[in-house]
Amino acid sequence: AAEALHPLHGVSATFSVVIADPKTGICGAAVASKYPAVGKVVAYARPGVGAFCTQHWHNPKWGEHALDLLERGHQPEAVLGILLKDDPRRDKRQLAIINLKGRAANRNPANADPAGHYWGAMSGRFYACQGNTLTGREVIVAMAKACEETKGSVADRLMAALVAADCAGGDHRGRLAAGIRVCKPDVKGYWLEMHVDKSDDAVIDLLKKYNAANHPAKGQWKPGHRPFQHPCPNRPKPKAPNPR
């Protein structure tokens, strides 16, 4: 019983996004957090299947397992139900999943740690975004808005969502790590994978790597035009929301 009070793998307080494009079959996930190397333990995707994120009290063993269940034909909501059914830490989990039809599902931590405030999630047409330990609800709203309004590829939209969340305040503890993973049906493994494992400004550093990359996962940009110049370079340092 005592063990159930503690995370098995870590507390990855964070914000993340999953996106799928049914027309191209491209899918992916992106994440940022104060947790080191967060992109390697929270965000998962698989060609021809979909994308998944496990966070707050994350369980990296669920990454491939969730995608296995999705590949076997389970709907996203059912996958999350299977994962959580016998999990003694289910009230601490925050999960998101999407299949290649664009059907998404979220679960929020019903008993989040006090430091996990603010937490929340939103989903829409072909995306889901979620977060905990945020500066406020505006972080989730900003991610959703970026997913809805950004023109370009799946990778572009994932990056835009991270940048929007960062501008809105992001993780109230800081900006240590970020990552993006994108899959394409005819490419084994990750088509695009970038990580910043430790940094003073991880989203900005990931953005710089993305801007500098010559990769077909990125949208068609006009010569000399980089669409993700950070719109809020002078944003204030993150801080926890006022207690309710």
What are these model-predicted stretches?
Residues 3-244:
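N-terminal nucleophile
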